[in-house]
UniProtKB/Swiss-Prot annotation:
InterPro entries: NA-bd_OB-fold, RNA-binding_domain_S1_IF1, S1_domain, TIF_IF1. This is Translation initiation factor IF-1, chloroplastic. GO terms for cellular component: chloroplast; cytosol. It is found in: Plastid, Chloroplast. Belongs to the IF-1 family. Pfam families: eIF-1a. The gene is infA. Keywords: Chloroplast, Initiation factor, Plastid, Protein biosynthesis, RNA-binding, rRNA-binding. It comes from Garrya elliptica. Residues 1-71 form the S1-like domain. GO terms for molecular function: ribosome binding; rRNA binding; translation initiation factor activity. CDD domains: S1_IF1. Component of the 30S ribosomal translation pre-initiation complex which assembles on the 30S ribosome in the order IF-2 and IF-3, IF-1 and N-formylmethionyl-tRNA(fMet); mRNA recruitment can occur at any time during PIC assembly.
């Protein structure tokens, strides 16, 4: 049976060593996020101020996996 996970959106507030980030979720929770392997392989750069989607386990709601970086509205990409 596959573990159910919650998906939240949040804002990167701080960059930590080894691909870890401090993420403030939209519900004002502060969690520790780590980059998923798919994002790590595609060499995406995640910086403080970026909006991301985070997958949070129901068993440990203090850590989450960053699964998607949302586009900034003001960027020229």
């Amino acid at each position: 049976m596959k573990e159910q996970k919650w998906i939240h959106e949040g804002l990167i507030t701080e960059s930590l060593p080894n691909g870890m980030f401090r993420v403030r979720l939209d519900n004002e929770d502060l969690i520790l996020g780590y980059v998923s392997g798919k994002i790590r392989r595609s060499f995406m750069r995640i910086l403080p101020g970026d909006r991301v989607k985070v997958e949070v386990s129901r068993y440990d709601s203090t850590r989450g996996r960053i699964i998607y970086r949302l586009r900034n509205k003001d960027s020229k990409d």
